[in-house]
Amino acid sequence: MAAASGRAVTLLRVVFGVRQLGPTAAREWGARLSSLFDCQRRCVSCFAGASFSGPRLASASRHHGQSSAMDCFLGLSQPDGSLTSRPPGVSMHRDEQDLLLVHRPDMPENPRVLRVVLLGAPNAGKSTLSNQLLGRKVFPVSKKVHTTRCQALGVITEKEAQVILLDTPGLISPVKQKRHHLELSLLEDPWKSMESADLVVVLVDVSDKWTRNQLSPQVLQCLTQFSQVPSILVMNKVDCLKQKSVLLELTAALTEGVVNGKKLKMRQALRSQPGTPCPSPAVKGPNTQSVGGPQRIGWPHFQEIFMLSALSQEDVKTLKQYLLAQARPGPWEFHSGVLTSQTPEEICANIIREKLLEHLPQEMPYSVQQRTVMWEEGPSGELVIEQKLLVPKKSHVRILIGPKGHLISQIAQEVSRDLMDIFLCDVRLRLSVKLLQ
C-alpha cells in the first residue's frame, strides 16, 4: 500500500504546475494520502442550508480519487488504473468551464465521433439514461413531467471515440404546449437536434402500462420525417414486467415485427400463449399510417433493440459500448475533459428544480422562481452557493420551508450531495424562501 501510495503522489500539484518529489518525500505524502482516504466524509446541516465536506488535498477533486475537468485540460488527470475510472467532474468556475468548451480537442490520430439524440415521451427516463451513460448525474431527473426544459448536451470520450448525447425534452404536441403555456423550447428542441443527429435512441418505459404499447404520435412523426437517420429502440425497466410474454408482445408491436430489415421470429416463443397472434410486418407509406390500414403504432426500421433493467448497470454498459462502436471517423467536437456543455450555475439550478419537483405537491414546483445571489469559492476551496426561491403565495412559503424548516433543509442537503459529486469539491448551499412581490 505504501509503495502504491508513493507512486500515486510522485507528482504534487502546485497551483497550475507540478513539482517533482523525491522518494522520501513521496513516501511521506503517500502516508498522508492513505490516512486521508481512510477518513469518513463529514456532513453538517443547518436550517435552509447544508454543508458537505471531506478530506482535502491540493486539488478539490483529489479527495474523491477523481480528476476534475480542469485537471484533464492541464494534463494532470490520473492515468488508467487509478482509484476510479469515472469521468471527470465539472469545474465550479464558469470561466474554467467556458475555457474548456472552446479549447481545441485533444484528439488521437484516428478520431471517431457520433451525435446521438434521445427521443421519447415526457417522463420516459431519457435524462436518467443519459446520466447512467455519462457516469455522473448532470441532468435533472424527476417523476413529474417536463423536468428537462431545453436541450442539454453530454459528452462521453473513450480512447478514439467521442459520443455526444443530446438529452431532449419529451416530445409534445403544439396543442399541449399552448394549453399548458409551456416554453417553446419543449416543442422545438427535439426537432432541431434531429437535424445534426447520426443516431436516434428511442426510449420506452415498459413499466408504464398506459404508454408502453405504442410509440407516441410525436415520436413516430419525428422518425418518419428523419427516416434517413439510423435508429435503435431501448426498452427500459424490463425487470418490472412479471410476465416476460408481455415483453415479446411489446417488442413485436413497437417494431411492427421487423428489426434491421428482418422479420422477428416470435411464433415459437409465443406458442405457450393461446390466441396470441404472431405479428408480421406491413407495407407502410411515407406517413405514420399503414397503407390501407389503421394508425401506425410502431417503427419497422430500428437497427437494434436494447432491453435495460433498472437494477443492472451491465445493460447500460452494453448500450454504451454499442454507441462508442458506432462512432464514425471524424474530428472530435470537444476536449476529452468536457462532460457537459452546461454552465455550473445551470447545473445547480436544474438540480434544485429537480428536488422541488420531487418534494412539492401538484403544480406548486412549476411556479417557483430561482435566483442565485451568491456563487463563490470559500477559503478552504469549497463552493459556497446561496439561492433565493421566490413563490407567489404565503401558503407556498410555509409548505416549502416545512415544519421547523425540515423540508427546505432536506432539499438543501440532497442538492449539496449531488453537486459535490458533479463539481468534485465540498459544497455549502443555503436556500431561502421569499414571497414574490
Swiss-Prot record:
Please name the GO terms of the biological process aspect recorded for this protein, alphabetically.
ribosomal small subunit assembly
Q: Which NCBIfam families match?
A: small_GTP
Asked whether the keyword Kinase is assigned, the reply is: no
Record-given protein name = GTPase Era, mitochondrial
User: Species name for this entry?
Assistant: Ailuropoda melanoleuca (Giant panda)
Keywords assigned: GTP-binding, Membrane, Mitochondrion, Mitochondrion inner membrane, Nucleotide-binding, Phosphoprotein, Ribosome biogenesis, RNA-binding, rRNA-binding, Transit peptide
Where found, per UniProt? Mitochondrion matrix; Mitochondrion inner membrane
Question: How does this protein sit in the membrane?
Answer: Peripheral membrane protein
